[in-house]
Regions:
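S-adenosyl-L-methionine
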Residues: 1-24
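A conserved structural/catalytic subdomain of Rossmann-like adenosyl-cofactor enzymes
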Residues: 18-199
Length: 199
């Protein structure tokens, strides 16, 4: 923080999903890589989070927390394990429904397992959404990342294959993505189809 001329940072040491964290509607942008797995004691969880999705799983609670902490119109890009994207529990579906119905889920970028090796080998994705409180999801852009410029083994050596520049280019030109087929690396899925598949 000192390198960015922040001489008096506000740093709080607390459990972010607990009742002690009362931050609400304060941030314009949240970029996050929260803990992937784990559960917390139900009695300590903030009720405002369990109202969105009744669970003790941190991977879901953190996304609910980001929604609470954003200002209306605030944007978030967060890394989540695949379970958040494809989990079939009521809590998983409730969180996805919240994003699709009450906010604007803009993009889901699937990343290959190995991008966080040697620390974690789980498959992950990036959720990009805007807090609206009034919906706004019409189509969701999906991108299937195959490579990030590094080998997907424990060594993570630099390699030539890297989808990140392509992701950025396509994301900034989404109007060119509308006619892509589902067999391509990126494509849109209409909200109606997401709803039909139970989110």
């Amino acid at each position: 923080l000192l390198l960015h001329s922040i001489h008096e940072p506000h740093i709080a040491y607390q459990d972010s999903v607990s009742k002690n964290n009362e931050i609400e509607g304060e941030f314009d942008v949240i970029l996050a890589n929260p803990p992937f797995t784990g559960s917390v004691n139900k009695s300590t969880i903030s009720e405002s989070l369990t109202n969105i999705c009744s669970t003790t799983k941190t991977e879901l609670l953190f996304v609910a927390l980001f929604l609470r902490m954003l200002k209306k119109g605030g944007r978030c890009a967060c890394i989540v394990p695949d379970g958040v994207l494809f989990g079939s529990s009521n809590a998983h579906k409730a969180l996805r429904k919240e994003l699709v119905e009450n906010h604007q889920l803009q993009a889901v970028i699937s990343m290959p397992s190995g991008v966080f090796k040697p620390y974690a080998g789980v498959s992950t994705g990036i959720l990009i959404f805007t807090k609206t409180g009034a919906g706004g999801t019409d189509n969701v852009w999906f991108y299937d990342m195959k490579a990030d410029g590094y080998s997907l083994d424990d060594k993570r050596q630099p390699i030539e294959a890297n989808d990140i520049p392509d992701i950025i280019e396509r994301y900034h030109n989404l109007e060119k993505e509308t006619d892509r087929k589902r067999t391509e690396q990126s494509f849109f899925v209409p909200k109606a189809e997401i709803v039909q598949n139970n989110y």
